[in-house]
From Swiss-Prot:
Keywords on record: Nucleus, Transcription, Transcription regulation
Keyword Transcription: yes
Single Gene Ontology MF annotation: RNA polymerase I cis-regulatory region sequence-specific DNA binding
Protein name: RNA polymerase I-specific transcription initiation factor RRN10
Assembly with partners or alone: Component of the UAF (upstream activation factor) complex which consists of UAF30, RRN5, RRN9, RRN10, and histones H3 and H4.
InterPro entries: Rrn10, Rrn10_Saccharomycetes
A Gene Ontology term for the protein's cellular component: RNA polymerase I upstream activating factor complex
Function as written in the Swiss-Prot or TrEMBL entry: Component of the UAF (upstream activation factor) complex which interacts with the upstream element of the RNA polymerase I promoter and forms a stable preinitiation complex. Together with SPT15/TBP UAF seems to stimulate basal transcription to a fully activated level.
GO biological process: nucleolar large rRNA transcription by RNA polymerase I; positive regulation of transcription by RNA polymerase I
Transmembrane segments: none
Location(s), subcellular: Nucleus, Nucleolus
Amino acid sequence: MDRNVYEACSNIIKEFGTHVVSADEVLAEKIDNAVPIPFKTREEIDADVEKDRNEGVFEGNIIPDIDLRVVHYYATQLCLNKYPHLINAFDETSLITLGLLIEKWVKDYLTSIQTEQGRQSKVIGKGPCEFISKHIDYRHAPGNI
């Protein structure tokens, strides 16, 4: 069976019927382990995050909190409705980047409250949300991106 990264991301591939194969394992197998792919445990990632946070490199989480599978499915379906030739075009890096970008936009939007003429009003904050916006009713036009 020709296993691919997209099946691994969907937890479809099981090895020996006991455990789910990760996308990194499938990718390493595809390139005959020519380039070693580093595997970090959750504890190692948390330690690196804490070190970077203490040094002031960034704030927040290095891995997005939102469910990336939902984001991946939604983004894939949205793109495939308009661009069917892009099937299987997303990889793990793009998913993590998309998740981080969505969290940043939501944070920008939710934390921006300005006071105008003595009353508070919610407005889109300065940053990427201000420049990248398009009103779309996705129920009527899900492929309009």
